[in-house]
Amino acid sequence: MGARSSVLRGKKVDELEKIRLRPGGKKKYRLKHIVWAANELGKFGLAESLLESKEGCQKIITVLDPLVPTGSENLKSLFNTVCVIWCLHAEEKVKDTEGAKQIVQRHLVAETGTADKMPSTSRPAAPPSGRGGNYPVQQIAGNYSHVPLSPRTLNAWVKLVEEKKFGAEVVPGFQALSEGCTPYDINQMLNCVGDHQAAMQIIREIINEEAADWDVQHPIPGPLPAGQLREPRGSDIAGTTSTVEEQIQWMFRAQNPIPVGNIYRRWIQIGLQKCVRMYNPTNILDVKQGPKEPFQSYVDRFYKSLRAEQTDPAVKNWMTQTLLVQNANPDCKLVLKGLGMNPTLEEMLTACQGIGGPGQKARLMAEALKEALAPAPIPFAAAQQRRTIKCWNCGKDGHSARQCRAPRRQGCWKCGKSGHVMANCPERQAGFLRDWPMGKEASQLPRDPSPAGADTNSTPSRPSSRPAREVLAAREEAERAENETIQGGDRGLTAPRTRRDTTQRGDRGFAAPQFSLWKRPVVTAYVEGQPVEVLLDTGADDSIVAGIELGSNYSPKIVGGIGGFINTKEYKNVEIKVLNKKVKATIMTGDTPINIFGRNILTALGMSLNLPVAKVDPIKVILKPGKDGPKVRQWPLTKEKIEALKEICEKMEREGQLEEAPPTNPYNTPTFAIKKKDKNKWRMLIDFRELNKVTQEFTEIQLGIPHPAGLAKKRRITVLDIGDAYFSIPLHEDFRQYTAFTLPTVNNAEPGKRYIYKVLPQGWKGSPAIFQHTMRQVLEPFRKANPDVILVQYMDDILIASDRTDLEHDRTVLQLKELLNGLGFSTPDEKFQKDPPYKWMGYELWPTKWKLQKIQLPQKEVWTVNDIQKLVGVLNWAAQIYPGIKTKHLCRLIRGKMTLTEEVQWTELAEAELEENKIILSQEQEGCYYQEEKELEATVQKDQDNQWTYKIHQGEKILKVGKYAKIKNTHTNGVRLLAHVVQKIGKEALVIWGRIPKFHLPVERETWEQWWDNYWQVTWIPDWDFVSTPPLVRLAFNLVKDPIPGEETFYTDGSCNRQSKEGKAGYITDRGRDKVRILEQTTNQQAELEAFAMALTDSGPKANIIVDSQYVMGIVAGQPTESESKLVNQIIEEMIKKETLYVAWVPAHKGIGGNQEVDHLVSQGIRQVLFLEKIEPAQEEHEKYHSNVKELSHKFGLPKLVARQIVNTCAQCQQKGEAIHGQVDAELGTWQMDCTHLEGKIIIVAVHVASGFIEAEVIPQETGRQTALFLLKLASRWPITHLHTDNGANFTSQEVKMVAWWTGIEQSFGVPYNPQSQGVVEAMNHHLKNQISRIREQANTMETIVLMAVHCMNFKRRGGIGDMTPAERLINMITTEQEIQFLHAKNSKLKNFRVYFREGRDQLWKGPGELLWKGDGAVIVKVGTDIKIVPRRKAKIIRDYGGRREVDSSSHLEGTREDGEVA
């Protein structure tokens, strides 16, 4: 831990653990808080070593002081922790955090006199007085100077991003905080955002695009005069290739100033707006009020989504006035329309305050009861009925205003306003006509902005800042967007049905009226000129309305409705006007609860019930780069299989699933046939293994199967299956050619017929992913249109559950079947399950319960490994609902490397376990469905065989059960196993229910907390509450962390000879006692354990034991309670007897009293190699050069454990973990170069990409001349063919280009604002600075220390490929390249020779073969695809002149040419 372990020592640690986190709280400080604080200091550029002293803590408090009032919770916690550590160093006694802060405040005021008051972390501080503006560039004495952004501004920006999560508030917040900033300041703000790297990458891409556009629009001018300021490029505006001074000059120069800061701000705003849309995907058109949602909650969601919309204020104003009312639920909409034109938001909220509440429900119920209890009308007695008299003065029934005794009301008795009487009241008018412009006629869409219709508000009549034509165009564009949204996803009514095919093909241009069925489709119709609100009902045969008079030309008729039989009047040829369309139809009038237009009028109007869905388009699939399709020949098949395949292929060809392959198709895959389960039909299979190898990779979209315990309880369930699922989805045309296969014929009587797939083939690896993706798209509109219906789809199995009535549920299922059938998916009736029990995914489902389908365990006389594997699989499947299932001893039957067909010998324990499982399976178990409103609980139990079982339940109803028997270690601890059980249950619950259950665990709180304090880094554990159950898990023994004073100390050791397997184990004490035991057939680990057991046996109730074995220390520190090893069980029993025990580990033995003596005691005649004398030179080497582990191990022959310990004890090397060395794929001559800065000096760095070799030195100026000199110096030492740099001015200068041209070096540049393009040298800059920090004290000047650090990195760091240093690797690469070139030149001479040869005793000459290599005694010959080694005496080498030569022609044999033209 480096500096962290030395922050507090001895008594200070004890004092720390007594301080409470909060006054009066139970939790106290632990060492883990110190470790956390040390990690957090790095974020503020503070060293961890400052925590080791009082003065250092005071420096930290000084830095954190101004940040606390506006800081995050983490910052405040860090400040509090540092205050506590300061008090411990100052030996001040504190009880809690608040007391520590008060003490620190008092001391700092007394010592410095400047700390007037410590910041309070418990409440926010008031903002400081003064100007609050943010102006990084200020004019002082006529000159512009740059003032860096304050930490408070940066902290406000970070806090804004973290709290709002890129909500709509981030854009105006950025605009306010970045006002007047330069690109340097804006980049500083972006770099402060640590998380949200996806959003940062989006912003970087926008910056790159905008910078490229800027460069295109502003080309580079000609040569500039000396001293004149250059024009900014795109990378200059982004701040990557320009300085702050240049940015200020561009912004504030007298002639043609360029506001680079504002330009860069605009680029960032574009990126932020894109991020806002990504993080807030909800469209404003989709924000609708739920049936029971309060209006205030709906308004909050509406305005939150409105802020994320990036549009002009006029469109937002229209959205507010139109969509807010349009998307309200029917109850609120009715109230809002009564408020008149353009009500304020305050009026809307006030009016809709009680909607949906108990009061409104009571009023509606009273009105319904009043209508239901009203006396039935007497036939032909309408003339005798009298209208109820209502008083206009007091509003009561039973008397007129003349008879009213109440005081006379002033003003109008209708509206209450003065200035007119009730007869002239404008609100008494029917209001059918409007006195404002109607605008364009549009359809009555419940969700569309429309100036006419019963459910819309018109355009506001007050003047607008924009012309009316622009507002109308914006509204029309919004209408088109909304129409596309509705047509793409909602189930609705469309009328009229003209141009239906055009609409489904994707032409969204015509505005057919549509009605989303999220509420009742109600329109205003005119029956013989009389307005009436009617419901469009596709389930009604006739049309009936109430409240209108159509004369006496009618015929009486009795019709049956929802409320019983109704007496009506039937009128024929009545003129009806709906949606600006007139028809003549038959209509009835009568006492109906709601006015209905049935199918007779809907058909005449051309209306239809539609379910628009997206067209199933094939997904493009390609082969892997450089790969070609399969070309595998068809193997022979029996006549029976050929006939079956022929019949199957002809059927598939008729159905459009196959088509005949053209003769130019070169690809082929073997096909064969197997019998189906019923043994009567055949199934065609294609061996797509070769095609799968060359096809691109896919991702499984559905990662697991759904579980019935995660289903909500519903009254109706239906299960259906998609027949030939894969064959219903088209395969991309470009990929079909690779699926070609051939049907052979018997005796090759005729050419085989070749087919290719037009649909997804079975057995191809892309079919599951494409099918899952397509089904999600197909079912998405159905899910949106039926939010109350549960639709679970896994591959071709679909489950539909709802609480609807039987008729409505069956109608919904029918709609889904029609949807699937319309897209080409078949839903076979034999797999359609309407009544329980439903067979689904291996389960049996009932409306109120679920259980597993019948489980039959196999009965066999002879069991193989494969049989046992299948048996265990069946039992594990049953364990999800049958508690107590065990497979421990069954799994032990097949331990080790065994073949699948190998016979298994049963043990008594396994037979007993199987019989016990059979008894459990004979008792049927049932599971329940999930109820979200109830609490989810998990109860854990442990049986005698160390197997954990658990059940997840809600009250007494069990959802599912499970078991856990994984024991990863030989020596186990009950609390650790319990943590793994909790982890498994937590992950399982998150997957199935999306929430963590409340745990009932058999462990005491003290036991858990004692273990968790030491092992809290173990892994992810869900949050859980302790519930008291009988404790089964206990910690068996008490290990202390500090040596026990006054008790005997045992030094133990063991050793073993690997050849003879003989060993010794023993101990020696600080009081002179020792003991050695000779062991046979042992190992080093067993000898170490034996020595530890001897020390435990011979020690008293309290003891200190020192071991040098990490194996022993790991077992003891894990506090095992049981083990499979008899020796470890003996150690556990002895440790339980101890009152207290201290165990420590020390590396090696040298210089440690007692440990060195016992090592010599047990090593005589056993150990053969000692490396202790090399540890001190290795330590000196590391202190000097800070070499890594591999270098120390290689140079001094130390074990890696010892070398790693040397590195771990070095404070300078522990600020970062050990690097993972490697090598990128690069050419030999490729180098990267960059400039970095340290202590005010400029360091130019060049890195050889392939080896990691580094050249670096300090240069006086970052100019092109100095860079060119360094490049020339580098090129004179090493071979360079390619140099990669960034776009810095020194690297793009003419001097560098001239040197690169002269030396023949190809130069390339990185991408602006993307340092990953030169990632090797960027990383090496970081490593170089770390190395300099380690050896900084060994030299005075920066020039010297840079060269020393380069030497250490090139010659003292071993690792990567070949375990070589960078210098060795570079020299080896250059040498290898030269050898390859030499061998290539030598081998090129052999290309024009051919070899005839004889093999074995065969006297016939074979060949010719290609000569690959000629040695002194043999030659290497390539014949076809075979490579042969032939003795020289059996080979004849001739030169190939292109024509045929005789073998025996002596003029062409080896050695006969005078000019030496031989190999």
Swiss-Prot record:
Region (Dimerization of protease): 513-517, 561-567, 600-612
Activity regulation comment: Protease: The viral protease is inhibited by many synthetic protease inhibitors (PIs), such as amprenavir, atazanavir, indinavir, loprinavir, nelfinavir, ritonavir and saquinavir. Use of protease inhibitors in tritherapy regimens permit more ambitious therapeutic strategies. Reverse transcriptase/ribonuclease H: RT can be inhibited either by nucleoside RT inhibitors (NRTIs) or by non nucleoside RT inhibitors (NNRTIs).
Region called Dimerization/Multimerization of capsid protein p24, residue ranges: 279-365
Note on cofactor: Binds 2 magnesium ions for reverse transcriptase polymerase activity. Binds 2 magnesium ions for ribonuclease H (RNase H) activity. Substrate-binding is a precondition for magnesium binding.
Annotated site residue numbers, Cis/trans isomerization of proline peptide bond: G222, P223
Required cofactor names: Mg(2+)
Intervals of motif Nuclear localization signal: 26-32
Chain ranges of the RNase H type-1 domain: 1044-1167
Region (Interaction with Gp41): 7-31
Keyword vocabulary terms for this entry: AIDS, Aspartyl protease, Capsid protein, DNA integration, DNA recombination, DNA-binding, DNA-directed DNA polymerase, Endonuclease, Eukaryotic host gene expression shutoff by virus, Eukaryotic host translation shutoff by virus, Host cell membrane, Host cytoplasm, Host endosome, Host gene expression shutoff by virus, Host membrane, Host nucleus, Host-virus interaction, Hydrolase, Lipid-binding, Lipoprotein, Magnesium, Membrane, Metal-binding, Multifunctional enzyme, Myristate, Nuclease, Nucleotidyltransferase, Phosphoprotein, Protease, Repeat, RNA-binding, RNA-directed DNA polymerase, Transferase, Viral genome integration, Viral nucleoprotein, Viral penetration into host nucleus, Viral release from host cell, Virion, Virion maturation, Virus entry into host cell, Zinc, Zinc-finger
Binding of Mg(2+) 3, residues: D1234, D1286, E1322
Chain location of the short sequence motif Nuclear export signal per the record: 16-22
Residues annotated as site: Cleavage: 135-136, 365-366, 382-383, 431-432, 445-446, 512-513, 611-612, 1050-1051, 1170-1171
Alphabetized InterPro entries for the sequence: Aspartic_peptidase_AS, DNA/RNA_pol_sf, Gag_p24_C, Integrase-like_N, Integrase_C_dom_sf_retrovir, Integrase_C_retrovir, Integrase_cat-core, Integrase_Zn-bd_dom_N
Residues at the active site: D537 (for protease activity)
Cellular component GO terms held in the UniProt record: host cell; host cell nucleus; host cell plasma membrane; host multivesicular body; membrane; viral nucleocapsid; virion membrane
Protein name: Gag-Pol polyprotein
Species this chain originates from: Human immunodeficiency virus type 2 subtype A (isolate KR) (HIV-2)
